[in-house]
């Protein structure tokens, strides 16, 4: 049997030329860092270094940091990525040269009308949308939103109490995922859902579809390897955001907005209402007001940015408290002192809790959900003697920096005291970046922190957590794109008035 097909000479020649052209296409940019004298791992044709992500972004970044030092270069497909770890360089990228050179994040695929979402928008459009949304996230507006969040804190306590009464261990992602979903959908769309007990609700179903995201799935990998297909996909109206979901949310926002414009008597302070108000505000005349489609895009991106992150961080916090009972007890004592007799938390009482702040900050150090920060270089520039050509993605490996023993002695240990007032001066704001830094940091940072702290307070007022036989110790992270655990975090829950689950 002849294994080599009997093809004409012209066919073989065409095949050879095609392979050579494909090889040249796939390696054309791969000599950049060598030419600049920047070290880094050897890329493969077409793929670059993306196969290394199979062991986790954070593992790849930490290995490179250890091997190559402060600066290294690698390739996502053909895209050159420059990793920087020097705090002065990081400050230049995120703050000093944000508007002039490093304004934009890396485009990550065809996004359709979502190109106007604050996390994705570029240059002047981003500046306009950021300035229109900034008043929505002030401390005054956040203070008014606390009762909405607190309501779902009570739902969370009810759900946990029911779990405690079953006597079974609790899977944290289930209960905190439901809490996160309830708060985000309520503040972004003004809808009230108890998602744990109403999983068939169309808002719950559509939001969960929106969040099935993995940067290592074949679709994303093909875009990384062949970025020229992105404009073709845009023309074909194909988006990484599922069309049936965005269509449902667009119709929902339209319906809710029309209903609210008719009912002018009710005073609402959720994000949706604040954005509707901004459309009609005379103060926005210096910038074109948000269009209805832009308003929908912001609501969707709030879900996208807030759901997974909040539920994951809450799970990590409770896990650390369960495995460090002394810290859990100390935090409960602070909560009981500031809020005796399970008094409901307020904006001001949350801000009084220093130890709670330390616990949250230390958890975000160990588990920075945004493992990397990225900015695209808009023009040739030199920083700290390093030449960065236009088009290079500059990446700050937050996870690696948060685990660097040079800045954090015994970095794998959970030590909230690192963030005590007396140690604050030792923390470099460009090494510790759980929410990014500079003009393009996370606009929802204060909201996210308040949301998580309110949940922690309500939960610890009523329950204590302990490891059980199903608890994975030490916790292992899942290999892949996002910072998630290999196995769900499962804990025993004890009601502080005596009921025990998972005993």
UniProtKB/Swiss-Prot annotation:
Task: Give the highest taxon in the source lineage.
Answer: Eukaryota
- Tell me which cofactor or cofactors this protein depends on: heme
Reactions catalysed according to its record: an organic molecule + reduced [NADPH--hemoprotein reductase] + O2 = an alcohol + oxidized [NADPH--hemoprotein reductase] + H2O + H(+)
Localization (cell): Endoplasmic reticulum membrane; Microsome membrane
Task: State which Enzyme Commission number(s) the record gives.
Answer: 1.14.14.1
Q: Which PANTHER family match?
A: CYTOCHROME P450 3A5, CYTOCHROME P450 FAMILY 3
The lineage is: Eukaryota, Metazoa, Chordata, Craniata, Vertebrata
Task: Describe the task this protein carries out.
Answer: Catalyzes nifedipine and nilvadipine oxidations.
> Per its record, how is this protein called by name?
Cytochrome P450 3A8
Q: Which GO terms describe its molecular function?
A: estrogen 16-alpha-hydroxylase activity; heme binding; iron ion binding; monooxygenase activity; testosterone 6-beta-hydroxylase activity
| Topology versus the membrane | Peripheral membrane protein
- Which Pfam families does the entry link to? p450
Q: Which SUPFAM superfamilies match?
A: Cytochrome P450
Query: What's one GO-annotated cellular component?
Result: endoplasmic reticulum membrane
Q: What induces it?
A: By polychlorinated biphenyl (PCB).
Q: Which residues bind heme?
A: 442
Write out the GO biological process terms.
Answer: oxidative demethylation; steroid metabolic process
What the entry lists under InterPro entries is as follows: Cyt_P450, Cyt_P450_CS, Cyt_P450_E_CYP3A, Cyt_P450_E_grp-II, Cyt_P450_sf, Cytochrome_P450_3A
Which keywords are on file for this protein?
Endoplasmic reticulum, Heme, Iron, Membrane, Metal-binding, Microsome, Monooxygenase, Oxidoreductase
Q: List each coiled-coil range.
A: none
* Entry similarity comment: Belongs to the cytochrome P450 family.
